[in-house]
A protein has these predicted regions:
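Basic, helix-initiating cap at the start of DNA-binding domains
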Residues: 1-39, 44, 49, 55-56
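Solvent-exposed, amphipathic alpha-helical segments
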Residues: 14, 18-26, 72, 98, ...
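Short acidic alpha-helix initiation/capping motifs at coil-to-helix transition points
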Residues: 35-38, 151-156
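Short helix-capping/turn signature of helix-turn-helix
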Residues: 51, 104-109, 153
């Protein structure tokens, strides 16, 4: 009985991983159940039986992938700028190019906006948590501005500018980001 439950769980994970992989290859809501089934090594009926619809599959896959991202980024130590930047760089080295493609596709495929918006929410919450010690500014206006600065500097586009456009090594890009964040973490 346990072996059967374990096999069913593994099948579900293979299906979700297939959906996530296909999505990142070509960010679109036009993912076919047949492609997902083929990639996962199961029948289309298995995918439908398990998730009911393409919409449910995509929602489940997004939630499943999001949990992995949250776990990865959750390792960032609060108040430790170099440590947090290292975790952020790990994340962007794995997902950065994909996220940039998603954000570009969002313009053409408005249905992707929900996924992009969720990513923005996760990023904002991460910045609030990680940089909490530096958000104790004197006023709400200052806190809001400082948070916006952290969000912008730690954005995937900053990673792209440093790594892809400027051609910096990961180590140099990480150092550059720490240097850019440094003035925001000093008392004025």
């Amino acid at each position: 009985m346990q072996a059967r439950a374990d096999a069913a769980e593994l099948t579900g994970e293979r299906i979700l991983q297939a959906a996530v992989d296909i999505f990142w290859e070509r960010p679109s809501v036009q993912i076919s159940l047949e492609d997902v089934a083929e990639r996962a090594g199961v029948s289309s009926r298995t995918v439908i039986r398990r998730y009911g619809s393409k919409e449910n599959l995509l929602a489940s896959a997004a939630e499943w992938a999001g949990a992995g991202v949250a776990q990865q980024r959750g390792q960032a130590p609060v108040g430790d700028v170099p440590g947090s930047v290292s975790v952020l760089m790990d994340h962007y080295e794995e997902y950065g190019d994909r996220v940039v493609r998603l954000l570009a596709a969002e313009v053409e495929v408005p249905a992707l906006s929900d996924i992009a918006d969720k990513g923005r929410e996760v990023h904002m919450a991460w910045c609030k948590r990680v940089f909490a010690p530096y958000l104790d500014a004197a006023s709400a206006v200052q806190r809001r501005r400082r948070l916006a600065q952290f969000v912008a500097l730690c954005d995937v586009y900053t990673w792209k500018l440093l790594r892809r456009d400027a051609g910096l090594s990961r180590r140099q890009a990480e150092l550059a980001l720490v240097e850019m964040l440094s003035p925001l973490t000093k008392e004025s």
